[in-house]
Amino acid sequence: MAALAPVGSPASRGPRLAAGLRLLPMLGLLQLLAEPGLGRVHHLALKDDVRHKVHLNTFGFFKDGYMVVNVSSLSLNEPEDKDVTIGFSLDRTKNDGFSSYLDEDVNYCILKKQSVSVTLLILDISRSEVRVKSPPEAGTQLPKIIFSRDEKVLGQSQEPNVNPASAGNQTQKTQDGGKSKRSTVDSKAMGEKSFSVHNNGGAVSFQFFFNISTDDQEGLYSLYFHKCLGKELPSDKFTFSLDIEITEKNPDSYLSAGEIPLPKLYISMAFFFFLSGTIWIHILRKRRNDVFKIHWLMAALPFTKSLSLVFHAIDYHYISSQGFPIEGWAVVYYITHLLKGALLFITIALIGTGWAFIKHILSDKDKKIFMIVIPLQVLANVAYIIIESTEEGTTEYGLWKDSLFLVDLLCCGAILFPVVWSIRHLQEASATDGKGDSMGPLQQRANLRAGSRIESHHFAQADLELLASSCPPASVSQRAGITAAINLAKLKLFRHYYVLIVCYIYFTRIIAFLLKLAVPFQWKWLYQLLDETATLVFFVLTGYKFRPASDNPYLQLSQEEEDLEMESVVTTSGVMESMKKVKKVTNGSVEPQGEWEGAV
């Protein structure tokens, strides 16, 4: 490749090169976003995998929903010991809780168990066959597994690649025409059946299908691949390669049963966030004199959240209609989601530190928090994007999922530190009754602003010393008491904000997750409803607590503190401006007391 000719001077190329290097991480992220997952039409390719169990997918089915599984290639790198068993399992549950048989020891092999409540597909590559073992309740509670060579319900039974739509339509016709045949399946057929598979040089390929024909068969179905070793063989010496395609569909949507309402839910919540942002902008324009920089940052948050929800709804709409997202909409959603997450945690941390409310410069300790929170939040959002765009059965999926949980937990803990530090400063200021030697950042800011006003009135330093010396002791103690009361009131407000953040974290991270595990499969969308509702309530309450209005307890207390300083200075100095101190002389003696006399 020919070298590019240099353009411009070396001095001009330096900044351009540095700017280009700074853009490399963003370009890498965009390249990742440009390859989203295939939605509910899944394709997974594993090469030399050593895992004992691979979770291929989980999907909630309504009546007349179906799944088509096409194993294009499955090959083994067999060790010397042939005592190995591989196959698939199909589990059905009513919610997203953990299946009991999957929580066993790592050496536990479900394929070798005699009595199980799941459907098993056990492969025998040497004999080029697969055995289907169904539990006793398979006739009514579980659907029948159909192979393309068993019953010609998939249209072209001898071809491995089948159109999922035509397969579903043809199968539905077969079920309608042969309903009596399905209902009279003998016990032997429901117990165990064997089917031949295509073997091409040790790589087998086959296709199976099932249809949800009754209401009792509705549920959350999970498909797993298992590798069972004998005589405690090392797992790394026994690898497998798998190329599989899975198509899942409900009657009117490619979305899982619990995800079908999500597009409408996201659009509705986007409207409420947009409405709250509009109201907030109206408040800022109405109270311009009380607005700080942080208020405008808070205004950007609901609009960014609303845009993210709109693009998320569009993304789910295309997945629902065609089984995979449109890349452009997916990329836009991921970008807005990344911005929303970073902006949310930055805003929470800035409010906790009191930036713009009580101080305009962040301390070194505050800056360290932002140096931790911002990269962690970006990493958490990148992990979320990778999870959304990666198939569930890949090796990196579990790693990124665990990383997302850990990083998000660290972010939630880190944003609490600025609030705790502000509370500690206020406690120290309140404990000293407002004495100047231990004033917290709130009192310091009020005094600085009062001092700037004093300078604007052209008071000399000598006048300030005179005012301080002439201030009665009772006035000083009164001011100290008022300052302590102000600090206590601000301390109460920051404690409320701390509780508000903790409740937000609990509702969106813990309670919502427990709800997701507990509710039936068709109500899984309640998890997203609770998460979005809790976020909206958190936005509204935070805006109410720190609203730019004269009746805001936080801002009102700061204003009262400043007014107290100005009233003490301006009123006293205005009276004393034309006064002078004199001593009364009576019969040559000087009286100790003094009084004020007006200067003529």
UniProtKB/Swiss-Prot annotation:
Localization terms from the record: Cell membrane; Golgi apparatus, trans-Golgi network membrane
Region feature (Disordered): 157-185
Residues with attached carbohydrate: 70, 169, 211
Membrane topology value: Multi-pass membrane protein
Effect of residue 182 to A: Loss of furin cleavage
Cytoplasmic side: 285-293, 359-368, 424-498, 545-600
Biased composition (Basic and acidic residues): 176-185
Superkingdom: Eukaryota
Statement: the UniProt record of this protein carries the keyword Thylakoid: no
Segments on the Extracellular face: 40-263, 315-337, 390-402, 520-524
Comp. bias (Polar residues): 157-175
Cystine pairs: 109-228
UniProt-listed InterPro entries: GOST_TM (IPR053937), GPR107/GPR108-like (IPR009637)
PTM annotation: Cleaved by FURIN to yield two fragments of 17 and 35 kDa that remain associated via a disulfide bond.
GO molecular function: clathrin heavy chain binding
Record keywords: Cell membrane, Disulfide bond, Glycoprotein, Golgi apparatus, Membrane, Signal, Transmembrane, Transmembrane helix
TM segment ranges: 264-284, 294-314, 338-358, 369-389, 403-423, 499-519, 525-544
GO biological process, one term: clathrin-dependent endocytosis
Pfam families tied to this protein: GOST_TM
Residues spanning the signal sequence: 1-39
Similarity comment text for this entry: Belongs to the LU7TM family.
PANTHER family to which the protein is assigned, alphabetical: LUNG SEVEN TRANSMEMBRANE RECEPTOR, PROTEIN GPR107
Annotated function: Has been proposed to act as a receptor for neuronostatin, a peptide derived from the somatostatin/SST precursor. Involved in blood sugar regulation through the induction of glucagon in response to low glucose.
This protein's name: Protein GPR107
Phylogenetic lineage: Eukaryota, Metazoa, Chordata, Craniata, Vertebrata
